[in-house]
Structure formats: C-alpha cells, structure tokens
C-alpha cells in the first residue's frame, strides 16, 4: 500500500478509541495523519472521553486521554490530502 496523507478532524470529548486507535493504526501502516481541531493549534490537546455501559439504562462517561494535535486547523488545505 502506498503512503497517503490523511486529515483527521477531531474535537474536545471525542470518543477516546474512535480517535486514538485509527490515528495510531494509520500511522503504523505508513500513512501521514494530520490531526486538527477548529480553534486549536499543533501541540494543543483535545480531551477524550470513554463511554462505558455499567448496568444503568445509558452509558457513563469517564475522562480519557489528552490527544495531542499535530497540525494547525487554520492553515489546513483539504486539497492537500488523499483522505478525510
């Protein structure tokens, strides 16, 4: 598989595994993944959340990781990417 440039748009309180796992997996197979968030810059972090069913009628929410952004949203040009 040839390396692709991928843009990942995320934000505060994103589901932890829905952000961390694809980001790490895509990079592990050789893709360049730029993670951005509106209003935040490279080096900033977004809060993630872990939702868990613990026997109640709905899920509980717990703090997840601080996910570090590695690109600036403001200077991102979608035309520079192979995938979103």
Across the structure, where does each feature detected by a protein language model lie?
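Extended, subdomain-level signal for the structured scaffold at the beginning of enzyme domains
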Residues: 1-83
